[in-house]
């Protein structure tokens, strides 16, 4: 080859553990959202970037789930007048560099102060990209913590086991002070609801005992994300709903989600979306937990 093309430089094929790295195999693992499998094809230094990639994938899968009751999707804006699909997508793109920073900075150890610092910068970037619209603050919190914990474990131990993951998330969240003056904080105070920080400090118990097993049981179902969203809505104290419509609105959302799950159909989803738009109900907290469930499913080795 060198005789034919004098300027030709032959680059050795990348290897991992003495075996050639297959780009096709890596892409297949990424498409499936399988961190453990993908790690077999990449050097250790690449793992944090892979974790961030799977986090972005989870956020986009939630956004792309269509139709969703009361939420922004490819079809409409749900109960929102200040955001649409394009804005939500732009928000995710703005957050991506910070998800990568969280993963890289946490590769050796968890530093709650650093997580908070990057999180604040990420929120500012999100608001700048969206013109001041809070599109992903809740998702940034839960996904950001989880990215840091997952990257730390994957890089230090080569695997993300549920017990260790929950321990790290709980430890990091316990060092983050409670927020004041937010819609979620007000809803938590007024309705005695469990907020996002409390859920994180408890290491998302319902996710591991209920939502994740349910999501995994629906593998191959084209409405897997839709049904999981509805399932989460039946059990979560969604502070987004409480802020907009109070306890009555939350009870209505839970009952309608349970009813639709019993007799599921795509047309039923569309009807529920119309109902939620009319009632000004947006299950944003449930959407955040769907994103988190998708992400955790992609990185965790077990659920116990």
Regions from the language model: what does each represent?
Residues 97-149:
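Long, hydrophobic/aromatic-enriched structural stretches that serve as scaffold segments
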Residues 48-108, 112-116, 150-274, 280, ...:
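Phosphate-rich cofactor/ligand-interacting catalytic cores and adjacent structured alpha/beta frameworks
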Residues 124, 140-152, 231, 290-297:
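Contiguous, well-ordered alpha-helical segments that form the cores/surfaces of helical PPI scaffolds
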Residues 132, 280-281:
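Residue-level signal for helical boundary/lining positions with a hydrophobic bias
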Residues 39-42, 137, 244-245:
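Short coil/turn segments at secondary-structure boundaries
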Residues 1-50:
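Active-site cores that bind ATP or allylic diphosphates and position pyrophosphate for catalysis
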Residues 22, 91, 139-143, 225, ...:
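Catalytic-loop motifs flanking and including active-site residues across diverse enzymes
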């Amino acid at each position: 080859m060198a005789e034919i093309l004098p300027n030709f430089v032959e680059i050795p094929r990348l290897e991992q553990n003495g075996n050639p790295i297959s780009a096709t195999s890596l892409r297949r693992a990424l498409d499936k959202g399988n961190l453990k499998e993908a790690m077999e094809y990449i050097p250790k230094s690449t793992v944090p970037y892979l974790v961030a990639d799977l986090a972005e994938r989870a956020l986009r899968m939630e956004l792309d789930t269509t139709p969703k009751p009361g939420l922004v999707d490819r079809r409409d804006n749900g109960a929102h007048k200040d955001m649409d699909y394009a804005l939500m997508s732009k928000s995710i793109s703005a957050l991506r560099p910070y998800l990568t920073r969280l993963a890289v900075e946490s590769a050796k150890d968890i530093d709650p102060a650093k997580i908070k610092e990057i999180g604040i910068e990420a929120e500012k970037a999100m608001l700048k990209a969206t013109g001041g619209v809070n599109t992903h603050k809740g998702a940034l919190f839960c996904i950001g913590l989880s990215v840091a914990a997952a990257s730390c474990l994957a890089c230090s131990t080569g695997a993300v086991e549920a017990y260790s993951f929950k321990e790290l998330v709980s430890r990091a969240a316990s060092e983050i002070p409670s927020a004041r003056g937010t819609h979620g904080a007000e809803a938590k105070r007024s309705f005695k609801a469990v907020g996002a920080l409390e859920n994180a400090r408890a290491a998302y118990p319902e996710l591991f005992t209920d939502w994740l097993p349910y999501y995994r049981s629906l593998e191959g179902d084209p409405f897997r994300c839709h049904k999981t969203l509805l399932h989460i809505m039946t059990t979560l104290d969604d502070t987004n709903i409480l802020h907009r419509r109070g306890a009555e609105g939350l009870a209505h959302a839970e009952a309608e989600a349970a009813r639709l799950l019993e007799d599921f159909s795509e047309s039923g989803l569309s009807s529920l979306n119309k109902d939620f738009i009319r009632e000004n109900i947006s299950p944003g907290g449930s959407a955040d937990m769907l994103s988190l469930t998708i992400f955790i499913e992609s990185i965790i080795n077990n659920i116990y």
